[in-house]
Amino acid sequence: MSMTPREIVSELDAHIIGQNEAKRAVAIALRNRWRRMQLPEELRQEVTPKNILMIGPTGVGKTEIARRLAKLADAPFIKVEATKFTEVGYVGKEVDSIIRDLANVSMKLVRQQAVEKNRMRAQDAAEDRILDVLLPPAKDQWGNVQESDNTSTRQIFRKKLREGQLDDKEIEIDVAAQVSVEIMTPPGMEEMTSQLQSLFEGMSPNKTKKRKMKIKDALKVMVDEEAAKLVNPEELKQQAIEAVEQHGIVFIDEIDKICKKGEHSGGDVSREGVQRDLLPIIEGSTVNTKHGMVKTDHILFICSGAFQVARPSDLLPELQGRLPIRVELKSLNKEDFERILTEPNASLTLQYRELMKTEGVDIEFTKDGISRIAESAFRVNEKTENIGARRLHTVLERLMDSISFDASERSGEKIVIDEKYVSDALNDVVENEDLSRFIL
């Protein structure tokens, strides 16, 4: 991650409105990953990541920040829900599976990078295989390949192949047969399932099967096959583990849902158990994965939660201490809703305009229309449950309902969505609290 904090914030600004404090914290944490790697080896081991706790109501951008980070961070990244895990001894996934899943993500990322690195060599080898099908080499009576004078013909066909002139021609090729082993195991034993599948697939002989396909499709398949032959699996495992240990990022959502509430017991015991199981992973421990042992000392953890019922102080004190950076995300107001409708690169109004364009219908959202939509969403949030920006989706779906249904019969029309149009479509529902609760 060589982007500066300012560049990271700017990239997040293109998709997320407001919440500058959270963006800054995340940007600094990401940049510190790069800074740490520039330090001498001895000092580098001493610098641990400053984990982040994001606190804010639902629908203000916590999950969206995670989604955008996953695209920005050229590093192993995984987002998980805290509620999916149970403490050891209960039925369900154990928290160690977070690191195993992160190692799998890292392996996939490293393999993709290795394939891209070898793509040119793989492309040449794949072209040779296709040319062998199109122009089979001549063989003598003992089956040995003869030196022939078809080199010039081969070059002509290679040129046609690269220019795409042969793309739609069908050929029959030998491709590696995918061995699939289905194993049913109880919940919480996914790691055993994965290891058994790897074992049985490794025992199966490498088989090929004949498939008929267009040359452009055959070329893609063969490039992937040839690239896979050029990578060293053991080397990939080492690179994947190093990438996880030095650059891995884990985003844990809904962390507030595993807080112990008040003096209740029962199910809360398991919740507190999940927190206890998270402690060693966040602090630094070693987890066994199918790719090797992974140390979690330098993995960055970003946790988030609404904390509407529980409070951050309800987390175990030890866990609070392992999340030193606290960031509070603010509730969204009407002006924020207006910006969300227009400013992001793929704003909601732009999405609806482009969707309707596919039917030949031209949609125009006026400034006063957008203001009225934002006001309606804000008022419904105030009257009923506050679900933040997610309310805009339900309001817009209600607003666009008749247009979406009739669009295929209204090709060539231009529809202006102004304040009057929005009021006529939404007033009854917005004003009636019972209707708002069930429809919006």
From Swiss-Prot:
One of its GO terms (molecular function) is ATP hydrolysis activity. ATP binds at residues 17, 59-64, 253, 318, 390. GO terms for biological process: protein unfolding; proteolysis involved in protein catabolic process. The keyword Mitochondrion does not apply. Keywords: ATP-binding, Chaperone, Cytoplasm, Nucleotide-binding. SMART domains: AAA, ClpB_D2-small. Its main location: cytoplasm. Belongs to the ClpX chaperone family. HslU subfamily. This is ATP-dependent protease ATPase subunit HslU. The lineage of its organism: Bacteria, Pseudomonadati, Pseudomonadota, Gammaproteobacteria, Pasteurellales.
